[in-house]
Regions:
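Short, surface-exposed connector motifs at secondary-structure boundaries
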Residues: 20-29, 52-53
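Glycine-rich phosphate-binding "P-loop"
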Residues: 1-20
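Long, charge-dense
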Residues: 53-112
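General beta-strand structural signal in soluble alpha/beta enzymes
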Residues: 12, 31-34, 58, 88-92, ...
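Histidine-anchored nucleotide/phosphate-binding helix
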Residues: 37-50
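Gly/Ser/Thr-rich loops at beta-strand to alpha-helix junctions
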Residues: 30-40, 63, 125-129
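Internal alpha/beta core interface subdomains
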Residues: 115-143
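Gly-rich Lys/Arg/Thr-decorated short loops/hinges at beta-loop-alpha junctions or inter-strand turns
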Residues: 1-3, 113-116
Length: 143
């Protein structure tokens, strides 16, 4: 297990290296979260260089996560990834989705949000890993 001193994108490079190394050693596929495609493109390049032959699934944010009706992931990046064998999944966030709307409107907390808050106690990255795995599983990209 690796524990980083600081949070955020500063850890992406090392995290991708660890994920690739572990996936190769254990013959695993990789699910990667990528809001705008930068992390997925970086992983794609690293995977090619490392000779990684497993499946890579990229999970992007749902439409409207930043601007109503828009997706932060450009079609150009999606096409590049897909042409290189990476499946791009765009879906409602598994640990917020509809419940977050109810919380905002009625001021209550619902079970799925409690799960998300519990996972965040281990770190935002832990919550994101669980969430994108659920999203990839829900749409049939992994089994």
């Amino acid at each position: 297990m690796t524990i980083f001193e600081k949070t955020g994108p500063v850890n992406s490079e090392e995290t991708l290296n660890i994920a690739l190394k572990t996936a190769k050693e254990r013959n695993l596929d990789i699910v990667v979260a990528s809001s705008e495609g930068d992390t997925a493109l970086n992983l794609m390049q690293k995977a090619k260089e490392a000779g990684f032959a497993g499946k890579i699934v990229c999970v992007s944010c749902a439409y409207g996560s930043k601007t109503p009706g828009e997706n932060r992931f450009s079609q150009e990046r999606r096409t590049t990834l897909e042409q290189n064998g990476i499946r791009v999944v765009t879906a409602a966030h598994a640990l917020s989705g509809g419940e977050r709307g109810l919380t905002k409107m009625f001021g209550s907390v619902h079970p799925v949000e409690l799960i998300a808050y519990t996972l965040r106690m281990f770190g935002q990255g832990t919550k994101v890993c669980v969430e994108v795995a659920l999203m990839a599983l829900d749409c049939g990209s992994i089994s």
